[in-house]
From Swiss-Prot:
InterPro entries: Ribosomal_eL40_dom (IPR001975), Ribosomal_eL40_sf (IPR038587), Ribosomal_zn-bd (IPR011332), Ubiquitin-like_dom (IPR000626), Ubiquitin-like_domsf (IPR029071), Ubiquitin_CS (IPR019954), Ubiquitin_dom (IPR019956), Ubiquitin_ubiquitin-like (IPR050158). Residues 110-129 are annotated as: Disordered. It holds the Pfam family Ribosomal_L40e. In the N-terminal section; belongs to the ubiquitin family. There is a cross-link at residue 48 (Glycyl lysine isopeptide (Lys-Gly) (interchain with G-Cter in ubiquitin)). This is Ubiquitin-ribosomal protein eL40 fusion protein. It comes from the Eukaryota. GO terms for molecular function: structural constituent of ribosome. Keywords: Cytoplasm, Isopeptide bond, Nucleus, Ribonucleoprotein, Ribosomal protein, Ubl conjugation.
Length: 129
């Protein structure tokens, strides 16, 4: 049978599937056509997100049904080498005790006028792990 997959860009993909096909199989077919890895795909039908282990017939998906493809949001973790680089630039700074401006590590006076270019600087506190 034939089903349609509509992307967020409005593009419609046609797939030839069987009712016994799993959602994983459908995602693999989408990867073959579009090059989107299955772990980044979320398929929606009738307002429900489809789970990988289930079949098309479990969701009552029939011929010429339309599934909606949404890409999974990624984030939340930083590669260790990038975290080290970020800590070097963000954590080894000095802070003005009067205006709380962030200053370079070797600064001796604040660069802001509002605190009168004070020399009262402290090292930035280390983040709690």
């Amino acid at each position: 049978m034939q089903i349609f997959v509509k992307t967020l860009t409005g593009k419609t993909i046609t797939l030839d599937v069987e009712p016994s096909d799993t959602i994983e199989n459908v995602k693999a077919k989408i990867q073959d056509k579009e090059g989107i890895p299955p772990d980044q795909q979320r398929l929606i039908f009738a307002g429900k997100q489809l789970e990988d282990g289930r079949t098309l017939s479990d969701y009552n998906i029939q011929k010429e049904s339309t599934l909606h493809l949404v890409l999974r949001l990624r984030g939340g973790i930083i590669e260790p080498s990038l975290a080290l680089l970020a800590s070097k630039y963000n954590c080894e700074k000095k802070i003005c005790r009067k205006c709380y401006a962030r200053l370079p590590p070797r600064a001796t006076n604040c660069r802001k006028k509002k605190c009168g270019h004070t020399s009262q600087l402290r090292p930035k506190k280390k983040p709690k792990n």
